[in-house]
């Protein structure tokens, strides 16, 4: 995937997480409880486009943050 797109998606996730009032630790914990092997550090890397997202992580992030895929993948 294009690095600029990954950075934009990461920024979207960070913005949506902050809007929900969640910390990176909280999001990582919720993802772990949902079955994803992820740490706070990995969440931080996702948010700056330094780590790829796996499909199961995307699905859970959408559910945890209560947002749409359009909000996560918007590149405008």
Please state what every model-predicted region is.
Residues 13, 27-28, 43-46, 72:
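Conserved hydrophobic/aromatic packing and binding residues within compact polymer-binding modules
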Residues 32-52:
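Recognition helix of helix-turn-helix/homeodomain-like DNA-binding domains
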Residues 50, 54-71:
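DNA major-groove recognition helix of helix-turn-helix/homeodomain DNA-binding modules
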Residues 11-32:
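Short basic helix-loop element that most often maps to the first helix and adjoining turn
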Residues 13, 24, 40, 55-58:
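Helix-turn-helix DNA-binding elements, focusing on the entry/boundary residues of the two helices
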Residues 1-8, 74-75:
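A detector for short, charged/polar N-terminal pre-domain segments
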């Amino acid at each position: 995937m294009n690095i600029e797109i990954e950075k934009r998606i990461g920024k979207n996730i960070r913005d949506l997480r902050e809007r929900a009032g969640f910390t990176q630790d909280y999001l990582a914990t919720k993802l772990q409880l949902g079955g994803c092997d992820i740490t706070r550090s990995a969440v931080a890397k996702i948010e700056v486009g330094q780590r790829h997202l796996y499909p199961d992580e995307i699905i859970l992030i959408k559910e945890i943050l209560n947002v749409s895929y359009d909000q996560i993948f918007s590149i405008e």
